Swiss-Prot record:
Its EC number is 2.4.2.-. One of its GO terms (molecular function) is arabinosyltransferase activity. Keywords: Cell membrane, Cell wall biogenesis/degradation, Glycosyltransferase, Membrane, Transferase, Transmembrane, Transmembrane helix. The chain crosses the membrane at residues 23-45, 222-239, 252-274, 331-350, 357-379, 421-443, 456-478, 525-542, 555-572, 576-598, 611-633, 648-670, 690-712. The lineage of its organism: Bacteria, Bacillati, Actinomycetota, Actinomycetes, Mycobacteriales. One of its GO terms (cellular component) is plasma membrane. This is Probable arabinosyltransferase B. It is a multi-pass membrane protein. Its main location: membrane. It is found in: Cell membrane.
Length: 1083
C-alpha cells in the first residue's frame, strides 16, 4: 500500500508541477505581451496639457507687462488696435504695441511692433515691414470715414496685417503680409507708449507654447502601471520556467561578496576621498540647474538651450537629481549617485567580473590592483559630478554580469534582466549604447540558450518577457511627454546642434590631444590606458588560442563590448571627450586581464614584456605632454593647471620619453638574443611582481590626481577650493558665493586727498602730470571685455552705450566710466591720443588711508590700458607702469614714500578693458597712513596707452550676502554647482522669471562657452535677457586670491518699468500625436 501511496503522491506532484508549468508559460507569454503592448502604446496615449494665453491690456490699464517665453516665440498671436488710438498719439508718434522693448538689443530683428511716427503707421515684424500706411489715412474711429482698426495675425501660416476701412487703389481692403512661419515674433511681454485706461477694442492675444507642460491622463497612468506590473509578472513567470532545469537555487549574492581585502579598502577609500576633495565634471552646473528648475516647471527642460525643450527620450537620470534637490543641493549630496555607482562598479568587478574572466585573473594580486587602480584613475577625471557617464558605466557592467550569468547557468531570466538594464542604460543618454554592445557581444550564446529552452516551454513564454523588459523603459521616458513632443524636441536639438555626423568621430580624439582641459593629463590617461590594454589583449588572445587560467569566452565578450561601444560612439550626435568616462569600469576589467596576459606566465620572452612596458611608458609620455588641468573651479590652486608638469625646468613628459626610449632600445636588443636572455631580477620585478607596469602606472596617476587636489586645498586655504567648499557645506556653506566679494557701490570708499596745489586734473593728476588728459581714453573701452563687432550675445550695456557723456564730469572728462562709477564724483586721467606721442608721467596726490580691517582688505584703482601686473592665469604681464605707493609720516610732519606695490591685474592681456587693479592691504605695513598712484607711460606706441582713476578702499560683502538666495539669478551653465544657494531663474507655463543678476565663469569661458551656448539664436536664455534687460558688470574679487579671474557678477536693470503679466491658464487633453506646430528655430 505504501508503494501505491507514494506512486499516487508522485503522480499528483507531477500533475501539479505540470499545471504550474502551464500556468507559468501562459503568464509569461500573456503578461509579457500585455507589458510590451502597454509600453509601446504609452507614447501615443493622451496627456493633460496646461494651456496658457497672454491677453493684453490687463486690469483695464495700458501698462507694459513682461512675459518672456522660454520658447521665445508663441504658437500664434493676434492683435487688434482701434485706429482712434493712433489718432490720439502726439504728433511725434510712439509705439502703440510691441512684443519687446523698443530699446532692447536687436529688438526690431526679433519682435513685432505697431509704430507711429509723424508721417506713417508701420506694422513691422522681425525687421520686415508687413504694412505701412500714411498716418493721415489712419484717422477717425469705427463708423467714421477712414480706418476703423488695425488687425495683425502671426501664425504658422504667416504674418499678415489689415487696416480695416482703408482700401488700396483698386478698392480692395489694404492688407499685407508674408506666408512665412518663421516670421512669428519673439515675445518678452507687451510694451506700449500709451497710458491711461484701455480703450474698447484694443487687444492682443498670444497662445504660449506649453506643449511640454503636461501630465498623464488616467488612461495613460493605468497603461503605465499595467505595463510595469505585467512586466514584473512576466519576469517572475520566466524565472519559474527557469527552475525546470532541475538545478538547485543559487544565492543571488555569492559568499565571496562578504570577503574584503586590502584592495577593497584602498579602492573604496579612494572613492570616498575623491568624493570630498576631487574635481567635478564639466557639465555639473548644467545638470544642477536643470534639476533645480524641473519641479517648478513640471518637466525636465534643457534649461540653457533648445527653446526649453525636454531632455526626453534620454535623461531619466536627471529626474533622480530633481528628487534629490528636495533634500539638499549641497555638492556632496547631489553627487552621491556617482559615488554609489563607483563603489558598485568595484564590487561587481572584484566579485563578479574578474572571477568570470578566470582563476588566473582573480588569483593574481597585481591584476586585482590593476583593476582597482585603473578604475580609480579612469573614474576620477570623468565621473565625480552630475554627468551620467558613471551611471552608464554601472549599467553596462551590470548588463555584462547578467549576460555572463545567463551563459554560465543557461537560464533566460538573466537575459531578460540584462535587456531591462540595457534599456534603462540607453534611456540615460545615447552613449548608453555601451550596454547594447554588451548584449550584442553575448548574442550568439544567448540565442543558443533561447533555442535550447524553447524546446521545453515554447517560444512566446521566452520571447514575450524579453520584449516587455526591453520596452518598459518607455513608461519612464514618456511618462509626461508624448511621441509628438519628444519628436519635436529631438528635431530642435538636431537642427540647432551640436549634431555631428558619424564621419567626424575623429574630433573626439582630436580634442583629447589638444593641450586643454579636455586633453588634460587625467583625461588622457583614463582613455589611453584602456586603449593600450584593449589592443594588447586583442593581439595576445588572437595569437594564443588557449591561455591557462583565462576564460576565453568572457574575455572576448568583454573585448567585444568595448570595441562595439567605440563603433557605436561614432553615431553619437556629440563628440565630447567626457564620454570616455563610459569605459571606466569595463576598462578596469580589461586592465586586469591584460596584466595577466603580459605577465611572465603568459609572455615567456622578456622581449615582449619589455615591449609592453615601452608602450606603457609612451602612454605616460603622451599623458604628461599637456597640462594638469581640471574643469573650472576644480583647478584652483592645482599645480601646473595651465602648464606642462615639470621639475627643475625638465618636463615629466621628457623624462618618460627618455625612459620609453631606453626600454624600447632594450626590447629591440632582446629581439636579437635568445628567448631566455633578459630574465634578471630587475626585469622580473618590473613585469611580474606588485610593481607590474599597469598597476604601478595607474597607482602613480591616482596619487598624482589626489596630490593635485590636496595641493590645491593647501595652497588656496582659507579661500575657495573644491575640497574646502565641500567640507564647509556640511555646516551650511554656500560654495563660491561665500568667497566672492562684491562692491555694492563702487562709488563708495574713495579716500580724501591731502590738500595741495594741484594741476588741472585735480588731485588725481597731482602737481604736474605730463601727457595725461581728462579724455585720454579711446572710444568703446568697455569693462572687463574686448569689444568686438558684431556684438555677440550676453554683452553689457556699455557695448552699445554712447561713447561720450552728455555733460563733462568732475575734471572735465566726457569718457563713460565702468562699474557704475559716477563721473560727477570720480575723475579720470589717461594718455591716449591720436596726435603726437610723448612719454607720460603722473604722480597723484596722497590719499589718506584708513586703518585696515576685514571689511576693507583691498585698495583698488580702476584702470585701463596695457599695464604691468600679476595674475594667476597669465603670471607676470608687462606693460606700462601703474603702481600704488604707500607712505609713512615724515620727520617734518609730511609724508615719506615707504614702498610700492605692483597690482594684481586680471586682464593684463586685454589692454582695452576697464578693470580693477588690486593692491592687498596685507602687503602694506600696518602703519602706512597714505597712498598715491604713480603711473608712467614711456612708450611712444599709440596702443600703449593707460588710464587711471583715484584709489579707493571699497567695503566688500560676500556674494551670498549681497545677492542672497531669493532673488532670481541667471546662473551660466558652468557655474551652477559652485553656487548652490543662489536662486536660478525659474520657468513655468512657458514663461520664465526675470533675473536680477547673472553669474558667469571667467572671461575666456564666458566668451567661448556660455555666451555662445546660451545665445537666443540657439533657443538660449540670453535671447530673453538681451532683449529685455540691461547688464552692468559689478566690481568683484575672490577673497585672499586677488589675482584670480573667478568669473563675474552682472546686475540686470529693466529697460522699461513693467510688472509681470497675468496669464490665463487652462487645461486641454491632447493625444500622443497632437502638435501645435513646429517650434520656430530658424532666424
Amino acid at each position: 500500500m505504501s508503494v501505491i501511496y507514494r506512486a499516487h503522491r508522485v503522480a499528483i506532484a507531477n500533475r501539479t508541477a505540470s499545471r504550474n508549468v502551464r500556468v507559468a508559460r501562459w503568464v509569461a507569454a500573456i503578461a509579457g505581451l500585455i507589458g510590451f503592448v502597454s509600453s509601446v502604446v504609452t507614447p501615443l496615449l493622451p496627456v493633460v496639457q496646461t494651456t496658457a494665453t497672454l491677453n493684453w491690456p490687463q486690469n483695464g490699464q495700458l501698462n507694459s507687462v513682461t512675459a518672456p517665453l522660454i520658447s521665445l516665440t508663441p504658437v500664434d498671436i493676434t492683435a487688434t488696435v482701434p485706429c482712434a488710438v493712433v489718432a490720439a498719439l502726439p504728433p511725434s508718434g510712439g509705439v502703440v504695441l510691441g512684443t519687446a522693448p523698443k530699446q532692447g538689443k536687436d529688438a526690431n530683428l526679433n519682435a513685432l511692433f505697431i509704430d507711429v511716427n509723424s508721417q506713417r503707421v508701420d506694422v513691422t515684424d522681425r525687421n520686415v515691414v508687413i504694412l505701412s500706411v500714411p498716418r493721415n489715412q489712419v484717422a477717425g474711429d469705427a463708423g467714421a470715414p477712414g480706418c476703423s482698426s488695425i488687425e495683425v495675425t502671426s501664425t504658422h501660416a504667416g504674418t499678415f496685417a489689415t487696416f480695416v476701412g482703408v482700401t488700396d487703389s483698386a478698392g480692395n481692403p489694404l492688407r499685407g503680409g508674408f506666408p512665412d512661419p518663421n516670421l512669428r515674433p519673439q515675445i518678452v511681454g507687451v510694451f506700449t507708449d500709451l497710458t491711461g485706461g484701455a480703450p474698447s477694442g484694443l487687444r492682443l492675444s498670444a497662445t504660449i507654447d506649453t506643449r511640454f507642460s503636461s501630465t498623464p491622463t488616467t488612461l495613460k497612468r493605468f497603461a503605465m502601471m499595467l505595463a510595469i506590473i505585467t512586466t514584473v509578472g512576466a519576469l517572475v513567470a520566466l524565472w519559474r520556467l527557469d527552475q525546470l532545469d532541475g538545478r538547485r537555487m543559487r544565492r543571488l549574492i555569492p559568499a565571496r561578496w562578504s570577503m574584503f581585502t586590502l584592495v577593497d579598502v584602498a579602492v573604496i577609500f579612494g572613492f570616498l576621498l575623491w568624493h570630498v576633495i576631487g574635481a567635478n565634471s564639466s557639465d555639473d552646473g548644467y545638470q544642477m540647474q536643470m534639476a533645480r528648475t524641473a519641479d517648478h516647471s513640471g518637466y525636465m527642460a534643457n534649461y540653457f538651450r533648445w527653446f526649453g525643450s525636454p531632455e526626453d527620450p534620454f535623461g531619466w537620470y536627471y529626474n533622480l537629481l530633481a528628487l534629490m534637490i528636495h533634500v539638499s543641493d549641497a555638492s556632496m549630496w547631489i553627487r552621491l549617485p556617482d559615488l554609489i555607482c563607483g563603489v558598485a562598479c568595484w564590487l561587481l568587478l572584484s566579485r563578479e567580473v574578474l572571477p568570470r574572466l578566470g582563476p588566473a585573473i582573480v588569483g593574481f594580486k597585481p591584476a586585482l590592483w590593476a583593476a582597482g587602480l585603473v578604475l580609480l584613475a579612469a573614474w576620477m577625471p570623468f565621473n565625480n559630478g552630475l554627468r551620467p557617464e558613471g551611471q552608464i558605466a554601472l549599467g553596462a557592467l551590470i548588463t555584462y554580469v547578467l549576460i555572463e550569468r545567463a551563459i554560465t547557468y543557461g537560464r533566460m531570466t538573466p537575459v531578460a534582466l540584462a535587456t531591462l538594464t540595457a534599456a534603462f542604460t540607453i534611456g540615460i543618454q545615447p552613449t548608453g549604447l555601451i550596454a547594447v554592445a554588451a548584449l550584442l557581444a553575448g548574442g550568439r550564446p544567448m540565442l543558443y540558450i533561447l533555442v535550447r529552452r524553447h524546446r521545453a516551454v515554447g517560444a512566446w513564454p521566452l520571447v514575450a518577457p524579453l520584449l516587455a523588459a526591453g520596452t518598459v523603459v518607455l513608461t519612464v521616458v514618456f511618462a509626461e511627454q508624448t511621441l509628438s513632443t519628444v519628436l519635436e524636441a529631438t528635431k530642435v536639438r538636431t537642427a540647432i546642434g551640436p549634431a555631428q555626423a558619424w564621419y567626424t568621430e575623429n574630433l573626439r580624439y582630436y580634442y583629447l590631444i589638444l593641450p586643454t582641459v579636455d586633453g588634460s593629463l587625467s583625461r588622457r590617461f583614463g582613455f589611453l590606458i584602456t586603449a593600450l590594454c584593449l589592443f594588447t589583449a586583442v593581439l595576445i588572445t588572437l595569437r594564443r588560442k588557449q591561455i591557462p587560467g583565462v576564460a576565453r569566452g568572457p574575455a572576448w565578450r568583454l573585448i567585444g563590448t568595448i570595441l562595439g561601444t567605440m563603433f557605436f560612439l561614432t553615431f553619437a550626435p556629440t563628440k565630447w571627450v567626457h564620454h570616455f568616462g563610459l569605459f571606466a569600469a569595463l576598462g578596469a576589467a580589461v586592465a586586469a586581464l591584460t596584466t595577466v596576459l603580459v605577465s611572465h606566465e603568459v609572455l615567456r620572452w622578456s622581449r615582449n614584456r619589455m615591449a609592453f612596458l615601452a608602450a606603457l611608458l609612451f602612454v605616460m609620455t603622451l599623458c604628461f605632454a599637456t597640462t594638469n588641468g581640471w574643469w573650472y573651479v576644480s583647478s584652483y590652486g592645482v599645480p601646473f593647471n595651465s602648464a606642462m608638469p615639470r621639475i627643475d625646468g625638465i618636463t615629466f613628459s621628457t623624462i618618460f620619453f627618455i625612459l620609453f626610449a631606453i626600454v624600447a632600445l632594450y626590447a629591440y636588443y632582446l629581439h636579437f638574443t635568445n628567448t631566455g636572455h633578459g630574465e634578471g631580477r630587475l626585469i622580473r620585478t618590473l613585469t611580474v611582481s606588485f610593481w607590474a607596469p599597469i598597476p604601478f602606472a595607474a597607482g602613480l596617476m591616482t596619487l598624482v590626481f589626489i596630490g593635485s587636489m590636496v595641493a590645491g586645498i593647501v595652497r588656496q586655504y582659507p579661500t575657495y577650493s573644491n575640497g574646502w567648499a565641500n567640507i564647509r557645506a556640511l555646516t551650511g556653506g554656500c560654495g563660491l558665493a561665500d568667497d566672492v566679494l562684491v562692491e555694492p557701490d563702487s562709488n563708495a570708499g574713495y579716500m580724501t586727498a591731502l590738500p595741495s596745489n594741484y594741476g588741472p586734473l585735480g588731485p588725481l593728476g597731482g602737481v604736474n602730470a605730463i601727457g595725461f588728459t581728462a579724455n585720454g581714453v579711446p572710444e568703446h573701452t568697455v569693462a572687463e571685455a574686448i569689444r568686438i563687432t558684431p556684438n555677440q550675445p550676453g554683452t553689457d550695456y556699455d557695448w552699445e552705450a554712447p561713447t561720450k557723456l552728455k555733460a563733462p564730469g568732475i575734471n572735465g572728462s566726457v569718457v563713460p566710466l565702468p562699474y557704475g562709477l559716477n563721473p560727477n564724483k570720480v575723475p579720470i586721467a589717461g594718455t591716449y591720443t591720436t596726435g603726437a606721442q610723448q612719454q607720460s608721467r603722473l604722480t597723484s596726490a596722497w590719499y589718506q588711508l584708513p586703518k585696515p580691517d576685514d571689511r576693507h582688505p583691498l585698495v583698488v584703482v580702476t584702470a585701463a590700458g596695457k599695464i604691468t601686473g600679476n595674475s594667476v592665469l597669465h603670471g607676470h604681464t608687462y606693460g606700462q607702469t601703474v603702481v600704488l605707493e604707500y607712505g609713512d609720516p615724515g620727520p617734518n610732519g609730511g609724508l615719506v614714500p615707504a614702498g610700492r606695490l605692483v597690482p594684481d591685474d586680471l586682464y593684463g592681456e586685454q589692454p582695452k578693458a576697464w578693470r580693477n587693479l588690486r593692491f592687498a592691504r596685507s602687503q602694506m605695513p600696518f602703519d602706512a597712513v597714505a597712498v598715491r598712484v604713480v603711473a608712467e607711460n614711456l612708450s611712444l606706441t599709440p596702443e600703449d596707452w593707460i588710464a587711471v582713476t583715484p584709489p579707493r578702499v571699497p567695503e566688500l560683502r560676500s556674494l551670498q550676502e549681497y545677492v542672497g538666495s531669493s532673488q532670481p539669478v541667471l546662473l551660466d551653465w558652468e557655474v551652477g554647482l559652485a553656487f548652490p544657494c543662489q536662486q536660478p531663474m525659474l520657468h513655468a507655463n512657458g514663461v520664465t522669471d526675470i533675473p536680477k543678476f547673472r553669474i558667469t565663469p571667467d572671461y575666456s569661458a564666458k566668451k567661448i562657452d556660455t555666451d555662445t551656448w546660451e545665445d537666443g539664436a540657439n533657443g538660449g536664455l540670453l535671447g530673453i535677457t538681451d532683449l529685455l534687460l540691461r547688464a552692468h558688470v559689478m566690481s568683484t574679487y575672490l577673497a585672499r586670491d586677488w589675482g584670480r579671474d573667478w568669473g563675474s557678477l552682472r546686475k540686470f536693470d529693466p529697460l522699461v518699468d513693467t510688472h509681470p503679466a497675468q496669464l490665463d491658464l487652462d487645461t486641454a487633453t491632447r493625444s500622443g500625436w497632437w502638435s501645435p506646430g513646429k517650434i520656430r528655430i530658424k532666424p
